[in-house]
From Swiss-Prot:
The lineage of its organism: Eukaryota, Metazoa, Chordata, Craniata, Vertebrata. It comes from Gallus gallus. PROSITE patterns: HSP70_3. GO terms for biological process: negative regulation of hypoxia-induced intrinsic apoptotic signaling pathway. The gene is HYOU1. CDD domains: ASKHA_NBD_HSP70_HYOU1. Has a pivotal role in cytoprotective cellular mechanisms triggered by oxygen deprivation. Promotes HSPA5/BiP-mediated ATP nucleotide exchange and thereby activates the unfolded protein response (UPR) pathway in the presence of endoplasmic reticulum stress. May play a role as a molecular chaperone and participate in protein folding. This is Hypoxia up-regulated protein 1.
Length: 1002
């Protein structure tokens, strides 16, 4: 099993602030078209790929649905060969698609065995197996996600609720919402939908591929990732660099610069062409047969085509063979790599397409690309690599990341970063939205001839490749009554006609505002600052309208106050950067700045990742949007698109200003020019004016009711979501009950077969009678016959009751066998403990009374325990020997264990006391006297001090030795006169005998 590099362990640290009652593990699911990879992070497991029940690192995305059975993974894949109609694969292509979408027709042509019907409410697709079995693609995906969570929980050995799920970068809003619906059906909390190309880039940035150091330690780089999977191809250009932030200093960052894709270019299309070619060869060999009309035979051919494609990637030719393909006819045909490449020649011509799209969207050329790295299983096809290498003009293609697992590992790193249970080193991720989004509205305008007409206006909300997560505010200045506007996709001319047809509706949402007129009537004394619509594109790339507000403002006179020196300085700086005048336009600009700053603060509080947009890039994006607004609308005060962190071009310190109409901009520019010409004099004049009159702005926000109509693919209603959740939960409960029943049936069968075999083993024959064995054998035979005749339809409870009945019948026999197995070991342990206890007791009683550390009661208690245990052992053994082996034993292993524990407790008590006992004061006094006599009393002193330590050595030599010498030695040295070292050494010599005895005892 592969493990994360050692340096990566330092990137992932468990946070200590999370309550232990909450699940700590998080997971990621790389949901590919053909297979999925699951990864987890939990305490002690930094980042690991989950193994499925077959111990494989990737699991087929397949679901098999029968009347009373549901299979996943390899089991479902096997069912696709036996019963293709009930096995479903590649259904992710149908997410967020209505029934008339070309992608639905393509799916039907690829898999004609499935019946697709229309959902009358949403106009989407439903798989119909029967009148009672009908499932939507979201429900299918929900089943797979729930299954993946089960695998992750089993691998992590704890519950998991939080997940990061990968989606293709080209998924639009409807497709992303469909994945979120599926996750909710599976009761998964989605921390983020991360684009699979972004997950790969993050994994490469964190790990540095197969290099020894992570990429963030290197300099600025542009990397192109070419990902060809089973269903589609995506090419991504990523910029890696280190950036400085105020809060965290220097941090690594990746930014998605450009993306190109081909929805239908992948390994599956190659396999389908190879399948059709094999079918043609079979029909040529057997003209009277048509294998194309047999779904089961075509499923076998597709499986063989998958194997053949893999083998031909390493061999020039290979023999395709299938036993019993159709009507028990075997199929065998030789296929060369050249034939395979000819079949897919037009597919290989499409390989450079995503590269050119990515370069175009990034506004780069190939000279700016440092490396091209391959991702995805289909990139292993040699012809793909050959064409791609020629298209990018590099010396070689990078293969230094795991093409199958990079996305799952990058996603699980992001899951750990978003989870509250872990703390990871920050790696800033700036993803990009592929498709531009704009706001459209219609307003009545007055022409030169005083006539009125309707004018359609468009404002860009998110440019193509705009970074996200990001919040935007649109301000409508000319509306005083209820109105509606539309959120649609922007210019998609970069897509070809096929992609546009698959893309679906270009209209996202119709927003109707209620209560605008009432807010103006209610606050007629206030000055209107417009109707502000707050949009948010979250970490998953899903756009939402958070709220709509009607903003009003008025000036309130304050009493004159003496300004402090610091306030004067601040006002001077503000006047220099913001203009010195107090025209009404300047007042409006100041108000907008305050509102926008509040918005930015709200955004900062909401961002959970800590991913911050660079102020410079945000300012550039804002400038582009403002410029486009000016070009498209002759009445620019009708609406303004405002990025949340727009930086003023004049203020390098990050002051924020809201987009203004040309009139306001013009007047502001004039004020700035005046400020430059007048210099400090103008600033001083402005200070004097502020001293005379210092108005205070009072802002009032009125919430506007909004009604949303989804125009692309209608979302599931809350009741529909709950109904789907219950449907999936019922299926899960049914699966668990079925597994429990199968487990009970297997346990019963195993018990019957094992016990029938045991009855004639020697140890069972020895402890049983012929009558007992016959009775047990009869009951086992009856149970076996019952299993064959009725057991297949028996309920789980009935199976468990039958097993419990048989176990009860055999309980006494098994007990006698088990006891006799335990006797030798238990009795040997008891005998050993008795011997050691007797030796210890004898040694303790040999200690002179003057040095005795044990009381008579303590020694007597130990002696009593030894005697009682010995008597019990002898009497019980004698009584047991009188009994027949087939009778219930009186010598029980649990009783032996109790006796061992009781005796060991008494011995251990005395050993602990000896270990920590201190020499009596009498010994210290004798030692001092012996020191004064030195040579004359040296021998006598040694004799007085050695016996207690000898006693302790007999008790437990290895424990007493270190406790004996240091206290005695320290006492002698402390009491000695200076220069008595030689005497001390002489006094220690007799202890050598004690040490020798200690070694002998050991």
């Amino acid at each position: 099993m592969a493990r994360a590099p050692r340096w990566m362990l330092g990137w992932l640290l468990l946070a200590c602030c999370v309550p232990h009652t909450e699940p700590l593990a998080v997971m990621s699911v790389d949901m590919g078209s053909e297979s999925m990879k699951i990864a987890i992070v939990k305490p002690g497991v930094p980042m690991e790929i989950v193994l499925n029940k077959e111990s494989r690192r990737k699991t087929p995305v397949a679901v098999a649905l029968k009347e009373n059975e549901r299979l996943f993974g390899d089991s479902a894949l096997g069912m696709s060969i036996k019963t293709p109609k009930v096995a479903f694969r590649y259904f992710q292509d149908l997410l967020g698609k209505q029934i008339d979408n070309p992608q639905v027709a393509l799916y039907q042509s690829r898999f004609p065995e499935h019946e697709l019907v229309k959902d009358e409410k949403r106009q989407t697709v439903i798989f119909k197996l029967s009148q009672t079995l009908q499932y939507s693609p979201e429900e299918m995906l929900g089943m797979v996600l729930n299954y993946s969570r089960g695998l992750a929980e089993e691998f992590a050995e704890q519950p998991i609720k939080d997940a990061v799920i990968t989606v293709p970068a080209y998924f639009n809003q409807a497709e992303r919402r469909a994945v979120l619906h599926a996750a909710r059906m599976a009761d998964l909390k989605v921390l983020q939908l991360i684009n699979d190309n972004t997950a790969v880039a993050l994994n490469y940035g964190v790990s540095g591929g197969k290099t020894s150091m992570p990429l963030h330690s290197f300099s600025f780089q542009n990397i192109m990732f070419y990902d060809m999977g089973a269903g589609s191809t995506v090419c991504t250009i990523v910029t890696y660099q280190t950036v400085k932030t105020k809060d965290s200093g220097t941090q690594p960052q990746l930014q998605i610069q450009g993306i190109g894709f081909d929805r239908t270019l992948g390994g599956l299309e190659m396999e389908l062409r190879l399948r059709d070619y094999l079918a043609k060869l079979f029909n040529d060999q057997h003209p009277s047969k048509d294998v194309r009309k047999n779904p089961r035979a075509m499923a076998k051919l597709l499986k063989e085509a998958n194997r053949l494609k893999t083998v031909l990637s390493a061999n020039a030719d290979h023999m395709a063979q299938i036993e019993g393909l159709l009507d028990d006819i075997d199929f065998k045909a030789k296929v060369s790599r050249q034939e395979f490449e000819d079949l897919c020649s037009d597919l290989f011509q499409r390989v450079p397409g995503p590269v050119q799209q990515a370069l175009s969207s990034a506004e780069m050329n190939l000279d700016g690309i440092d490396q091209v790295i391959l991702v995805g299983g289909a990139t292993r096809v040699p012809k793909v690599q050959e064409v791609l290498l020629k298209a990018v003009g590099k010396e070689e293609l990078g293969k230094n990341i795991n093409a199958d697992e990079a996305a799952a590992m990058g996603a699980v790193y992001q899951a750990a970063a978003l989870s509250k249970a872990f703390k990871v080193k920050p790696f800033m991720v700036r993803d990009a939205a592929m498709f531009p989004i704009q706001v459209e509205f219609t307003r009545e305008v007055e022409e030169d001839d005083k006539s009125k007409s309707l004018k359609h206006n468009k404002r860009i909300l998110f440019q193509r490749m705009a970074p996200y997560p990001q919040r935007k505010v649109i301000t409508f200045n000319r509306y005083t009554d209820d109105f509606e506007f539309y959120v649609n996709y922007g210019d998609l001319s970069f897509l070809n006609q096929d992609d546009l047809r698959i893309f679906g509706s270009l209209n996202l949402t119709t927003v109707r505002l209620k209560g605008v007129g009432e807010s103006f009537k209610k606050h007629s004394d206030y000055e209107s600052k417009g109707i502000k619509a707050h949009f948010n594109m979250d970490e998953s790339g899903v756009l939402s309208l958070d709220r709509v507000e009607s903003v009003f403002e008025t000036l309130v006179e304050d009493k004159l106050e003496e300004e402090s020196t610091l306030t004067k300085l601040g006002n001077t700086i503000s006047s220099l950067f913001g203009g010195g005048g107090h025209t009404p336009e300047a007042g409006e600009n100041l108000t907008d700045s305050v509102q926008e700053e509040e918005e930015s603060l709200a955004e900062a509080a909401k961002e959970e990742q800590g991913v911050k947009q660079g102020q410079k890039s945000s300012a550039e994006d804002a400038g582009e949007e403002q410029g486009e607004e000016k070009q498209q609308s002759p009445h620019p005060d009708q609406a303004e698109a405002v990025p949340p962190k727009e930086e003023s071009q004049k203020n390098e310190e990050g002051e924020k200003s809201e987009a203004r109409d040309p009139k306001e901009d013009k007047e502001t520019v004039n004020e700035e020019e005046l400020s430059k010409s007048s210099g400090a004099g103008t600033a001083a004049k402005a200070e004097e004016e502020k001293k005379i009159k210092a108005p205070k702005k009072q802002k009032l926000v009125h919430e506007i009711t909004m009604e949303l109509d989804v125009n692309d693919v209608p979302d599931l209603l809350e009741d529909e979501l709950k109904s789907s959740m219950k449907k999936l939960q019922d299926l899960t409960i049914r699966d668990l009950e079925k597994q429990e029943r199968e487990k009970s049936a297997n346990s019963l069968e195993s018990f019957i077969f094992e016990t029938q075999d045991k009855l004639y083993q020697e140890e069972y024959l020895f402890v049983s009678t012929e009558e007992e064995r016959e009775e047990i054998s009869k009951k086992l035979s009856e149970a076996s016959n019952w299993m064959e005749e009725e057991g297949y339809a028996a309920a789980t409870k009935e199976l468990k009751d039958k097993l419990a009945e048989l176990k009860k019948l055999c309980r006494n026999l098994f007990f006698r066998v088990e006891e006799r197995r335990k006797w030798p070991e238990r009795l040997a342990a008891l005998e050993s403990l008795l011997n050691h206890s007797n030796i210890f007791l004898k040694g303790a009683r040999m200690i002179p009374e003057s040095d005795q550390i044990f009381t008579e009661v303590e020694l007597g208690t130990l002696e009593k325990a030894i005697n009682e245990t010995t008597v019990w052992k002898n009497e019980t053994l004698a009584e047991q020997n009188k009994l027949s082996p087939a009778e219930k034993p009186v010598l029980l292993s649990k009783d032996i264990e109790l006796k061992i524990a009781g005796l060991d407790r008494e011995v251990q008590y005395l050993l602990d006391k000896a270990k920590f006992a201190k020499p009596k004061p009498k010994k210290e006094k004798n030692a001092t006297k012996s020191d004064s006599g030195k040579n004359a009393t040296g021998t006598s002193e040694s004799e007085n001090t050695i016996p207690p330590t000898e006693g302790k050595q007999e008790e437990k030599p290895e424990d007493i030795s270190p406790a004996k010498e240091p206290p005695t030695t320290e006492k002698v040295v402390t009491d000695d006169e200076p220069g008595s070292d030689s005497s001390s050494k002489k006094e220690k010599k007799p202890e050598a005998g004690g040490e020798s005895r200690k070694n002998d005892e050991l």
